[in-house]
């Protein structure tokens, strides 16, 4: 798969992960040229960790991978949408989606795994 998006070296762009069947928004992360190349090469979502400053394969610690089905680019070519098959939860807090609570703090998602067990904190 070729990419029409060229991400300049050192630049990060937002990458939204969305369930390819339901349309549910799962998470927002950032991607650079290295992560995009690895995603295209493997078919598994890779992102750039801003906090760790390194490439990160989604699910490398938890097993909760994102199998990429389609990649869309926005009109300005400065954000991408990954349509994925989510294995397990997308959120490191144990929820299927990182968008599991309302602005006033009400929980609207369901926790599907215990992060303390998965990440052995």
From Swiss-Prot:
Which Gene Ontology terms of cellular component type are present? cytoplasm
Subcellular location, principal? cytoplasm
Record GO biological process: L-histidine biosynthetic process
From the record, give the cysteines joined by S-S bonds: none
**Positions contributing to Mg(2+) binding:** 74, 76, 78
Q: How is the cofactor bound?
A: Binds 1 Mg(2+) ion per subunit.
Q: Where in the cell is it found?
A: Cytoplasm
Spell out the InterPro entries in the cross-references.
PRA-CH (IPR026660), PRib_AMP_CycHydrolase_dom (IPR002496), PRib_AMP_CycHydrolase_sf (IPR038019)
Q: Does the keyword Cytoplasm apply?
A: yes
GO MF terms held by the record: magnesium ion binding; phosphoribosyl-AMP cyclohydrolase activity; zinc ion binding
Q: What is its EC number?
A: 3.5.4.19
Q: Which residues bind Zn(2+)?
A: 75, 91, 98
Read off the Gene3D superfamilies from this record. 4.10.80.70, Phosphoribosyl-AMP cyclohydrolase
Which keywords appear in this protein's UniProt record, sorted alphabetically?
Amino-acid biosynthesis, Cytoplasm, Histidine biosynthesis, Hydrolase, Magnesium, Metal-binding, Zinc
Q: What class of enzyme is it?
A: hydrolase
Cite the annotated pathway: Amino-acid biosynthesis; L-histidine biosynthesis; L-histidine from 5-phospho-alpha-D-ribose 1-diphosphate: step 3/9
Functionally, this protein is described as follows: Catalyzes the hydrolysis of the adenine ring of phosphoribosyl-AMP.
Q: Which HAMAP family match?
A: HisI
Q: What name does this protein carry?
A: Phosphoribosyl-AMP cyclohydrolase
